Amino acid sequence: MAIQHPDIQPAVNHSVQVAIAGAGPVGLMMANYLGQMGIDVLVVEKLDKLIDYPRAIGIDDEALRTMQSVGLVENVLPHTTPWHAMRFLTPKGRCFADIQPMTDEFGWPRRNAFIQPQVDAVMLEGLSRFPNVRCLFARELEAFSQQNDEVTLHLKTAEGQRETVKAQWLVACDGGASFVRRTLNVPFEGKTAPNQWIVVDIANDPLSTPHIYLCCDPVRPYVSAALPHAVRRFEFMVMPGETEEQLREPQNMRKLLSKVLPNPDNVELIRQRVYTHNARLAQRFRIDRVLLAGDAAHIMPVWQGQGYNSGMRDAFNLAWKLALVIQGKARDALLDTYQQERRDHAKAMIDLSVTAGNVLAPPKRWQGTLRDGVSWLLNYLPPVKRYFLEMRFKPMPQYYGGALMREGEAKHSPVGKMFIQPKVTLENGDVTLLDNAIGANFAVIGWGCNPLWGMSDEQIQQWRALGTRFIQVVPEVQIHTAQDNHDGVLRVGDTQGRLRSWFAQHNASLVVMRPDRFVAATAIPQTLGKTLNKLASVMTLTRPDADVSVEKVA
């Protein structure tokens, strides 16, 4: 199905604040976030429509939280299957690892299956909310150049017409074969897996069993995944000497499917495609006024479903910083923290994905035997087994430097980690997720205390100019105690008791949360002012105009 934006009228020449190359998921998320921040954005896409065939099939809790930040999560959820377990099977069908993480610390299920084209369509439609965002399809980026204060892009339409775009910044979301990255000669180091995989998508799921199964068969490893809307995906390793053309032949496709279906002739094929798995990482994510994101910056095997989710992390990390710089609220040195924070974690996710692929299809037969033996031994080590089955091995993003203020012992500090998102009770009695109360803003969140108490008038002025929300968390039973109200502070009740537990664990009563929901700093009321001054310096924040209104509550 062709998916195109109905309200977009192309122009010959364009002048915008941000140009985004690529209307894939990362480019669309960047455009939605920047759009809601009032930034003038132009997305240019080489294809004439969104890609309409399934690619990624796993979306995690962090990516859903990112969707929530741009007001689209409720439209995305109908295209997901929550709590999607991953089960590893021996060649005889014995389940030796059942990964079923049941935590929802960030407000959403940790593992979910999804249909990418439908979610991409939700993000594209989301752009129609913003008159300051345009998306042009069938535009090939032929060349670009950087000047001191802008980037000039040269485009060619499908009819051969030329167009010019002048932008303050260019975000390259143009995929693993990124034209932008290659033009800038940014090394893309890593390796390509020797084996290819053929992906077969089938409508009216002929199995209809839930979850995803990875069968570690040394003869031909395969994957069977239940997807939303009754779609079944099979992935089979392409063996040496086989070609895509051969496997597409009806008799060979029937032979493949007979491995997993009792009646391989009675299926509704959607499509078959052969993929090569790459593990590569760009040496640099920022080159002056050009920033690389998503597959243009890193690509990884599919086995942990983290390629898509890593791209969402890029978009969430970069978009708020870019908005602050364009709005004049921070200097462009803030953008250097994008690579500083995201590159190491992208590398960790690449390594995890490669390892998972080696578990499914070990390069050596003896490694498969070792894997099966270790999995059997884990049954006698319940704590170790839970570590794997609850997916605690997944490297959670943690930043040790960048746009944050870390003091004291780094190992146990919450600074640089994503803040939790429990349910909270508002003063009108409504119960909602924490981010819904905050919006796409900074937040200073205090347990029991007035978060403005330790701030000077100048600090209140500076942080309010950023759109910061000041939140006082109280036990839910205290939410209607009127004498505790403070002007300019939103009071919320700790519905589930999770915020109290978080503050008790981390020996702090105040947390500064960034727009991407990461903890930028912690403090107590008497140290908050000093901490905010240091944080403003680290983030290269500028001083607001003197006419910004100030309310100081003692």
Curated annotation (Swiss-Prot):
Pathway info: Aromatic compound metabolism; 3-phenylpropanoate degradation
Family: Belongs to the PheA/TfdB FAD monooxygenase family.
UniProt cross-references to Pfam families, sorted A to Z: FAD_binding_3
Cofactor: FAD
Highest taxon of source: Bacteria
NAD listed as a keyword: yes
Binding of FAD, residues: 17-46, 285-295
Record keywords: Aromatic hydrocarbons catabolism, FAD, Flavoprotein, NAD, Oxidoreductase
Reactions this protein catalyses: 3-(3-hydroxyphenyl)propanoate + NADH + O2 + H(+) = 3-(2,3-dihydroxyphenyl)propanoate + NAD(+) + H2O; (2E)-3-(3-hydroxyphenyl)prop-2-enoate + NADH + O2 + H(+) = (2E)-3-(2,3-dihydroxyphenyl)prop-2-enoate + NAD(+) + H2O
PANTHER family: 3-(3-HYDROXY-PHENYL)PROPIONATE/3-HYDROXYCINNAMIC ACID HYDROXYLASE, FAD-BINDING MONOOXYGENASE
Enzyme Commission designation: 1.14.13.127
Alphabetized Gene3D superfamilies for the sequence: 3.30.70.2450, FAD/NAD(P)-binding domain
Class of enzymatic activity (EC top level): oxidoreductase
Biological process terms in GO annotation: 3-(3-hydroxy)phenylpropionate catabolic process; 3-phenylpropionate catabolic process
Membrane-spanning ranges: none
Function: Catalyzes the insertion of one atom of molecular oxygen into position 2 of the phenyl ring of 3-(3-hydroxyphenyl)propionate (3-HPP) and hydroxycinnamic acid (3HCI).
Name of the protein: 3-(3-hydroxy-phenyl)propionate/3-hydroxycinnamic acid hydroxylase
MF term (GO), any: FAD binding
Gene assigned in the entry: mhpA
